[in-house]
Every structure is written in structure tokens, then in C-alpha cells.
Regions:
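Bacterial signal peptide processing site
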Residues: 20-22
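C-terminal motif of bacterial Sec signal peptides marking the signal peptidase cleavage site
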Residues: 15-18
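Generic N-terminal leader/processing signal
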Residues: 4, 24-28
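A compositional/structural signature for long, glycine/proline-rich flexible linkers
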Residues: 27-385
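Sec-dependent signal peptide recognition
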Residues: 2-10
Length: 385
């Protein structure tokens, strides 16, 4: 009988303890979700900003910029820019081609897709989002932490709940949906309309109070370092994978928001050195045959799209392929040249993007690669007219 009473007593204690733990967990969850609002669709990021959209900042003194915190600060700047377009309230659709020049909210945007962005709170080390089953074009979701790392890149349709490394103190994720332009603007916009707010936890992000003028100055300084040589991105997936802080700072300055290369799924990016817009060049390389598509886009020295609307990009959905399965891209070689990009006499750097990059291309395009025909940077030559 005594044993039975002891067991009953123990059961009561365990039950009370379990209830207390559940109440604490509920209280903690409620505290963690303080300030959260119901996620909504911002139909036009531009209209939202024009109506007075702005970012909300943390209290406290202005934070000085150091080599150690630069990536966090540059990331905060991008969160800030997209908050002004509604991304803290749900999913915000940029219904136009990426803006040219410094009007762009993010460096090195491209004209391969339309962008939709959301800032979402990390809950219990996870975030959730959806790629609907009935999307009309290439659709991906990239998940970026507060240090600029693309922790996840998803192309699979469906509802996703993914692990998110918060060991560096990250509390929110920056989600980028890309809707491909392979079927034109109208279809890409219709694809944006299919995207949902499923899984988003919106409304409570505040921007760290960095000295953003100093951030911009540091960014310009870093970009100036690499104008004379090709640049290859590594995009480590979290802070623990950063082995060279300066390299990572360069990557954030030149191409914040890029994805970590995963063969046959995510993307690879490479930047050329600066070239004179008064000369003619071409590069002929093996067809990269990316799973989705590849593209080449030109930028100015600050890595923004040229203001001139007539400066276009070239994309594998439309480029001409040579009979030997090579691709020739021409720069300022005249309208009759194959796949010609005219920079209107302006000096430029070009970026190659491989969406769904192959393992072979990854091996051929990195800082340790020897000259090879899968690397457009190595094949660039001046053309005598």
C-alpha cells in the first residue's frame, strides 16, 4: 500500500512538473511572438514605399563598423531597404525589373527574374514558407540569415519547414522568392500572385542601429579592391563556415544575397574584372548546361545595373549556341555579333550566374581553377574590328 501511495505521489509530482513546463513554454512562445502581426501580401513593393514605407530601428547608440561586424551591418542595410518596401509585414512583390543604379535595394540584382521578399521570425530554430504546386515558371526560395549567409536554397514545390542555424544570434530570416522571366513579364507577375504567406511570422524585426554611412563607405572601399581581377564567390552557409573574414566581407560588398553553390540545385556566381567599354571583347566557352538556366549581366564598378535601359543581359533561354556546343558572348562588338551586350561605351564588369549549377562547372569556376573552357573569365579576348 505504501508503495502504491508513493507511486501515486510521484505521478502527481510529475504531472504538476509537466504542466508547469508546458505553461512556461507557452509563456516563452507568447513572449517570443510579441509584436508579430498577421502576415499579408504586399502587392506592390514600390507603391508601399511611395506611401511612406520605412524601417523601424533598435534603440541605443549608433554602432561603429569594424571588419568583424561589417557583414552583419551590410545585411542589416538590406533588411532595412526591403522593410521600406513592406517585407516586414509579409511577402512583398517587386513587380518591375530590378531597378537600375543605386535605386536598387540590393547590389547586383538581375533581370533573370522578378523578386518577392519577406522577413520572417525564426521560431524554435526553424522557419517555414511555401512554393505552391501550381507555379508557372522557375521559382525558388533563398533563406538568408542576419550575417548574409544563404543557409537554404529551395526549388522543390510544397510547404517547407527547415532548420535554421541561430548559433550566431540570428533571430530573423530574409526570404527571397525568384520568379523566372523565361515566359515574359506577365507570366512572372502571375507567378508572384500564386505565392503565399504560409509559414511566415511577420512584423517584429527591428534594424540594428549601425552607422550606415560608414557601411556604404566600407562597401565602396571593398569593391575597389577587386576591379582589376576576376572574383569568385564561396558563400559559406553560416558564420561557422567562414574561414577568411576579409573574403566574406568582399562577397557581401560585391554580391550580397547570393546562394551557396549546391550542384544541380542552387546557384554559382562569378564576377569578371573591369573592362573598357571603348573596346570590343568576346568570350567563347563550353555550354554550361545548368539545370534551369544561365545568364550574363553587366554592371558598373559599384556593381549596380547600368542606368541606360538599352544595356541588356543575355540569358540561356534565348542565347544562340554554336554548332560545337559552345557559347559566344560579345561585348560592344556591334548588333550583328553573336549574343552582343552593348554597354554604350561604359566600362563594365560582368557576372555569370548558373541556376542549378553542375558539379563540372563548380570545379571549373573558383579561385584555384586553372584556365579551362568552362570558365568564361579565362576565355575573354579583345576583338579587333
Amino acid at each position: 500500500m505504501k508503495s502504491l501511495m508513493k507511486l501515486l505521489g510521484l505521478a502527481v509530482v510529475l504531472s504538476v512538473t509537466a504542466c508547469s513546463q508546458q505553461q512556461e513554454e507557452k509563456k516563452e512562445a507568447k513572449t517570443n511572438l510579441a509584436g508579430v502581426v498577421e502576415s499579408k501580401v504586399i502587392s506592390s513593393a514600390i507603391a508601399y514605399q511611395q506611401a511612406g514605407g520605412k524601417a523601424e530601428f533598435m534603440d541605443g547608440e549608433v554602432i561603429k563598423i569594424t571588419d568583424q561586424n561589417y557583414a552583419h551591418a551590410e545585411t542589416a542595410k538590406n533588411y532595412r531597404n526591403w522593410m521600406a518596401k513592406g517585407a516586414n509585414e509579409g511577402i512583398s512583390h517587386l513587380r518591375i525589373l530590378a531597378p537600375r543604379g543605386k535605386k536598387a535595394p540590393t547590389v547586383q540584382m538581375n533581370h533573370d527574374c522578378l523578386y518577392s521578399v519577406a522577413i520572417t521570425k525564426v521560431v524554435a530554430g526553424k522557419i517555414s514558407f511555401e512554393i505552391p504546386q501550381d507555379v508557372l515558371v522557375y521559382t525558388s526560395v533563398q533563406v538568408i540569415d542576419q550575417y548574409g549567409h544563404g543557409q537554404q536554397y529551395i526549388v522543390t514545390k510544397g510547404k517547407h519547414t527547415v532548420d535554421f542555424d541561430i548559433s550566431d544570434g540570428t533571430t530573423h530570416a530574409f526570404l527571397i522568392w525568384r520568379s523566372g522571366l523565361e515566359k515574359g513579364m506577365n507570366v512572372a507577375k502571375a507567378n508572384q500572385d500564386k505565392l503565399t504567406t504560409w509559414g511566415l511570422v511577420s512584423g517584429d524585426f527591428k534594424v540594428p542601429n549601425y552607422d550606415f554611412e560608414a557601411v556604404d563607405a566600407k562597401t565602396a572601399e571593398l569593391r575597389s579592391e577587386v576591379t582589376g581581377k576576376a572574383f569568385y564567390y564561396t558563400f559559406p552557409r553560416n558564420e561557422k563556415e567562414v574561414t577568411d573574414r576579409h573574403q566574406w566581407n568582399l562577397e557581401c560588398a560585391l554580391g550580397w544575397g547570393g546562394a551557396s553553390p549546391i550542384a544541380n540545385e542552387a546557384n554559382l556566381y562569378t564576377n569578371s574584372k573591369m573592362y573598357s567599354g571603348e573596346k570590343s571583347y568576346s568570350t567563347t566557352f563550353m555550354n554550361p548546361e545548368s539545370v534551369y538556366f544561365s545568364s550574363i549581366t553587366v554592371y558598373n564598378a559599384q556593381r549596380y545595373l547600368f542606368e541606360d535601359e538599352e544595356v541588356k543581359n543575355v540569358n540561356s533561354n534565348t542565347w544562340l549556341v554554336n554548332s560545337d556546343n559552345t557559347v559566344t558572348i560579345s561585348f560592344n562588338c556591334g548588333p550583328d555579333a553573336k549574343n552582343n551586350i552593348d554597354t554604350k561605351g561604359q566600362d563594365y564588369t560582368f557576372t555569370v550566374r548558373y541556376y542549378g549549377v553542375t558539379e563540372q562547372v563548380i570545379r571549373a569556376n573558383n579561385k584555384d581553377a586553372v584556365p579551362n573552357r568552362l570558365n568564361p573569365m579565362f576565355m575573354m579576348t579583345e576583338v579587333t574590328q
